[in-house]
């Protein structure tokens, strides 16, 4: 909801799709591939970036990304790691797949 409000207040036209799914590598990969094939501009995912056995989001995204953008997530880890040390354990990733920007947020 926050993302939708932010973009609508900036006067941009956006279409936001929310999907809640289990920690399933094949299901996540299929969804991301479908969105990339549709030339979606930006994909944000939340969760699944930690070091637990079910945290698979960065691993799936790495298979799809053509170019990684490491600085974005490094900045987020440093900024929030000072206040929330567990943020430093995040394996968040950002990159480009075709024409689509992908961000795996904690």
How should these model regions be labeled?
Residues 1-106:
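Non-catalytic beta/alpha edge segments that cap or flank active sites
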């Amino acid at each position: 909801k926050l993302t939708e409000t932010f973009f609508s207040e900036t006067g941009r036209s956006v279409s936001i799709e929310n999907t809640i799914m289990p920690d399933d590598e094949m299901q996540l990969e299929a969804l991301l591939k479908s969105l990339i094939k549709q030339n979606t501009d930006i994909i944000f995912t939340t969760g699944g970036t930690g070091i637990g056995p079910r945290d698979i989001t960065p691993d799936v995204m790495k298979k799809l990304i053509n170019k990684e953008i490491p600085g974005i997530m490094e900045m987020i880890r440093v900024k929030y790691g000072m206040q929330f040390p567990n943020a430093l354990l995040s394996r968040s990733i950002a990159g480009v797949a075709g024409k689509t920007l992908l961000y795996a947020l904690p």
